[in-house]
């Protein structure tokens, strides 16, 4: 029996956007109500997705500037990044382009990304919205996905567990079934550009790199 394929999944994003809560929720099926560590301990377990078993390794990172020099050490060998921002924090949304994409493309230029908007429960809470109107919409999240060329965009809530499993199932699928980005040989003068069309469809409309 062959060994399960190992997939290293690294979560990145601003501090306090809920990366660690999301990981704890995914691995324990419950929302942490007491102490929440700054960084989640590395986790590894066999996971079944679409009938295929993989060994999923989860790596958490601290988003604060104090860890900027150490954080890239976690990127080595990564198969997929889960890049998170908070749906109730415009600053964390803007930092995806300002901070995180430059960092990821510098240290891991060819690793695919799943973009995740966290704290969905608060964005959908009418009581919360009464005092906080500067939230990120689904349309804005999808626009950002296209801008950075992420393979997928998912909104989730660790508190209600909505879509948390979908985040990591999607990350696994992206690694197992990467978008086709083969270029048509240039020696053929009458090529049909079919490679670009396929990549766009598989990626859900994103532009192939």
UniProtKB/Swiss-Prot annotation:
A GO molecular-function descriptor: GTPase activity
Keyword annotations from UniProtKB, A to Z: Abscisic acid signaling pathway, GTP-binding, Lipoprotein, Membrane, Nucleotide-binding, Palmitate
GO biological process: abscisic acid-activated signaling pathway; small GTPase-mediated signal transduction
Effect of residue 206 to S: Affects the membrane location
Post-translational modification: Although this sequence has a C-terminal -CXXX, it is palmitoylated at Cys-206, rather than prenylated.
Pfam families in the record: Ras (PF00071)
CDD domains registered for this protein in UniProt: Rop_like
Topological type in the membrane: Lipid-anchor
Lipidation (S-palmitoyl cysteine): 196, 203, 206
Gene Ontology CC terms, in alphabetical order: plasma membrane
Main subcellular location: membrane
Keyword GTP-binding: yes
Residues reported to bind GTP: 13-20, 60-64, 118-121
InterPro entries for the chain: P-loop_NTPase (IPR027417), Small_GTP-bd (IPR005225), Small_GTPase (IPR001806), Small_GTPase_Rho (IPR003578)
Location of the protein in the cell: Membrane
Keyword Lipoprotein among UniProt keywords: yes
Motif (Effector region): 35-43
Record note on what altering residue 203 to S does: Affects the membrane location
SUPFAM superfamilies: P-loop containing nucleoside triphosphate hydrolases (SSF52540)
PANTHER family in the record: RHO FAMILY GTPASE
Family: Belongs to the small GTPase superfamily. Rho family.
Function statement: Acts as a negative regulator of abscisic acid (ABA) responses.
Protein name: Rac-like GTP-binding protein ARAC7
Organism: Arabidopsis thaliana (Mouse-ear cress)
The gene coding this protein: ARAC7
